[in-house]
Amino acid sequence: MRVGPLHGWSERFAALPDGVQIVAEPFVAMSDVRIDPAESGPLAAHLGVALPTTPNTWVQGDTTTVIWLGPDEWLVTSPFTTPEELESGLRAAVGGAGAVVDVSAQRTTLSLRGEHVRDVLATGCSLDLHPRVFGAGSAAQTTLGLAGVVLLALDGTGTHYEVLVRSSFARYLATWLLDAASE
């Protein structure tokens, strides 16, 4: 049986105060893609969505999320497929024009929702998370607590975020979030 880094934490998350909900989403398939954006047409066709080229943004395809990490680097995630299927499909689309690496085991995903979740994040993140600045479609590689994360804004109201944290830091970050939410 596969066990994610936050296996057994659902009861702790369920005990959070009203206004903050955290759900661990383990085993999301993730691949890092490096390609010149000018050569990304076949990849975009495969994904069903153009790669975001505006820094610190993400886009949603039918079954994948594509996160801008750099001028020629994206993180492609999908909870709907296996890491092997995601990587092989991306490799076929990229061909010799770029590189694809499976990084699924590197990170785990946390979904954070609620009217106070932005306040919780703000206690440990130096970014301005107000929806006018960090609204739906925004993404950033940043620090939350002392953990490096990829942070996605999933709505325009500041009440739904996704946090991708290195698996080895997942328990630290979960403990930090529980503490920050109880303040």
Regions found by a protein language model. Give the residues of each.
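Basic, glycine/lysine-rich polyanion-binding surfaces/domains
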Residues: 1-183
